[in-house]
Amino acid sequence: MKLVNASDYNLPSRVILRAVDENHIAIVKLIKSRIIQKDAAKIVEIARQIQSVDADMKVSLVCSSAICSKSLTLLKNEGIGVIIEEL
């Protein structure tokens, strides 16, 4: 997967984006700690920002397996797919 420049979507440079496919981008959060609902809410805001620039863009999250069930539910309800990768 190719890295995408976050500034193209008016996002801070610390946000890591990867192109998964044409019209499909992934937000990368490979951290050791668990992703909680507060983190998921921030991911939803990033996804909305990406889709405000390119409405046809599908957004997914690339993360480790440490993600809480409430976060998974929130992401699923917002149409954000989850791709599990190991650290």
Where does each model-flagged region fall?
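Arginine/glycine-rich "motif VI" loop of SF2 helicases in the C-terminal RecA-like domain
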Residues: 48-56
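Hydrophobic beta-strand segments of well-ordered beta-sheets in folded domains
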Residues: 23-26, 55-61
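Short, compact, well-ordered microdomains
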Residues: 57-87
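Glycine-rich phosphate-binding "P-loop"
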Residues: 23-42
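Histidine-anchored nucleotide/phosphate-binding helix
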Residues: 41-49
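Active-site metal-binding core of divalent-cation-utilizing nuclease and nuclease-like domains
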Residues: 1-20, 38-39
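Generic preference for hydrophobic/aromatic residues in regular secondary structure cores
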Residues: 11-21, 27, 77-85
